[in-house]
Amino acid sequence: MSYFRTAILLAGLTGLFMGVGYLIGGAAGAMIALVVAAATNMFAYWNSDRMVLSMYGAHEVDAGTAPDLHRLVAELAARAALPMPRVFLMDNPQPNAFATGRNPENAAVAVTTGLMQSLRREELAGVIAHELAHIKHHDTLLMTITATIAGAISMLAQFGMFFGGGNRGNNGPGIIGSLAMMILAPLGAMLVQMAISRTREYAADEMGARICGQPMWLASALAKIDDAAHQVPNREAERAPATAHMFIINPLSGHGMDNLFATHPSTENRIAALQRLAGQSGSATPDPAPAPRGPWNGGAPRRGPWG
């Protein structure tokens, strides 16, 4: 998805929010909704990373407590021309990961213990590179904004349904139209949020593959994580499904294929896209970029920068 289309979708979310506000309080309600949207996004801008990391019980690690992971993130961040993000570990058996933070200078990468135990070093590099791609694309802020506005639309619509719309003049939509809008607006907001999330995943897959130098490392990791996500529950994510879009693979049980209600593209489609990228880049041959010494290898030259 182009950034222009993303901007259009964000504008649509804001318009939905103002529309619900209008149905409740007329023009004044629309303006109040706009102010509320700005205020909630400002709060999310400064606090969302701490909130989500705390929600998942993530604890920060460093070169002393998790040297291999920390060194891998540092090397990949340097390769991506990014500041070193903070690194967090979640005590969770489901292999998964996400990135958060308002900008690259205040970003964090969080991985589960299940991910560390399930993946080979090359696959872990692919996952970390994918999360760094989200940071590089400023997707962490984008998804925070969309989730915040979508949540506010649902909350405001519920408020309107409980108290009834206040804009019922002759030129208004009437009570039936108001109720329909208040029911459909949250659904529309969710669809827009999911559309943005799904397409940003494709962009992060491509950039992540270029950062680590081997698209198939990420493809292999996605297959393993997706298989495990169907079998290993993520209880924290089940309690907070609004955060599911943050993860590299949908952490919720029962997630389906590539459809309007999916938080992520289907894993099969993502792997196919990475396979096409591998064919275009000729990644079956050694990566043309200089290969830095990786955290797990013994210095022997292998395919790609870490394997």
From Swiss-Prot:
Its EC number is 3.4.24.-. It comes from the Bacteria. Pfam families: Peptidase_M48. It is a multi-pass membrane protein. The active site is at residue 131. Residues 278-307 are annotated as: Disordered. Zn(2+) binds at residues 130, 134, 201. Keywords: Cell inner membrane, Cell membrane, Hydrolase, Membrane, Metal-binding, Metalloprotease, Protease, Transmembrane, Transmembrane helix, Zinc. One of its GO terms (molecular function) is zinc ion binding. GO terms for biological process: proteolysis. The chain crosses the membrane at residues 16-36, 145-165, 172-192. Its cofactor is Zn(2+). It is found in: Cell inner membrane. Its main location: membrane. GO terms for cellular component: plasma membrane. HAMAP family: Pept_M48_protease_HtpX. Belongs to the peptidase M48B family. This is Protease HtpX homolog.
